[in-house]
């Protein structure tokens, strides 16, 4: 008798723990989704700017990703500096807004398109600039907060 009631108690505790975890996950998903909506709309609006190059260089995607890297650097440094920041706010800003705003898939697509067109040098320049400027932007964002 004692053994079976102990197991039943553990099962109840386990179910409660799972329900609490699921609730936290759903709330986190809502924060990421709301931020993603904002970031995606901002990304779309930036894409409407009349910025073009004669050679088809994807300058708008580069600008978008560098801005996003700079902002995520600010957020990461602010979260590290101020541990009182709400983790859900950090999730909303980093995974949500920055994740929705920046785009690796577009970067990869544009690089592949340039290579298909025989613009290997331009594609290589784009990859190098994206990596270097992205890392520098994160670093500058972090320095701004420190």
Regions found by a protein language model. Give the residues of each.
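Membrane-interface helix-loop junctions in multi-pass transporters/channels
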Residues: 2-146
